Swiss-Prot record:
Gene that this sequence comes from: GHRL
Locations listed in the record: Secreted
Post-translational modification note: O-octanoylated by GOAT/MBOAT4. O-octanoylation or O-decanoylation is essential for activity. The O-decanoylated form ghrelin-27-C10 differs in the length of the carbon backbone of the carboxylic acid bound to Thr-27. 33% of frog ghrelin is O-decanoylated. 80% of frog ghrelin has Asn-52 cleaved from its C-terminus giving rise to ghrelin-27.
Official protein name in the record: Ghrelin
Function: Ligand for growth hormone secretagogue receptor type 1 (GHSR). Induces the release of growth hormone from the pituitary. Has an appetite-stimulating effect, induces adiposity and stimulates gastric acid secretion. Involved in growth regulation.
Naturally occurring in which organism (per UniProt): Aquarana catesbeiana (American bullfrog)
GO MF annotations, alphabetized: hormone activity
Tissues where the protein occurs: High levels in stomach. Moderate levels in small intestine, pancreas and testis. Low levels in heart, lung and gall bladder.
Lipidation (O-decanoyl threonine): T27
């Protein structure tokens, strides 16, 4: 029984060490072979005319586009007061809708208390 536990432990340990070894060595090619593969891949990219993302990002990062335009609005004092009241009513009603239903009903029943 003791031998069986040791055997199982040994097999598990061997499997764990084997997977770490496989993860550590990505490829068994020599550096010269890896350079050949890299050259082939770069030639394929150039042949198809694809531009890598870094090259595109560098080109766009240098450009800065800015457009300015005036936002002038002319209105009378009366028009301004109407617009101001409309915006205040809109904001007040939207804020009330966020409140509880009972608070909203109380405000609607007694408009003079505001």
């Amino acid at each position: 029984m003791n031998f069986g536990k040791a055997a199982i432990f040994g097999v598990v340990l061997f499997c764990l060490l084997w997977t770490e070894g496989a993860q550590a060595g990505l490829t068994f090619l020599s550096p010269a072979d890896m350079q050949k593969i890299a050259e082939r891949q770069s030639q394929n990219k150039l042949r198809h005319g694809n531009m890598n993302r870094r090259g595109v990002e560098d080109d766009l990062a240098g450009e800065e586009i800015g457009v300015t335009f005036p936002l002038d609005m002319k209105m009378t004092q009366e028009q301004f007061q109407k617009q101001r009241a409309a915006v205040q009513d809109f904001l007040y009603s939207s804020l009330l809708s966020l409140g509880s239903v009972q608070d909203t009903e109380d405000k609607n029943e007694n408009p003079q208390s505001q």
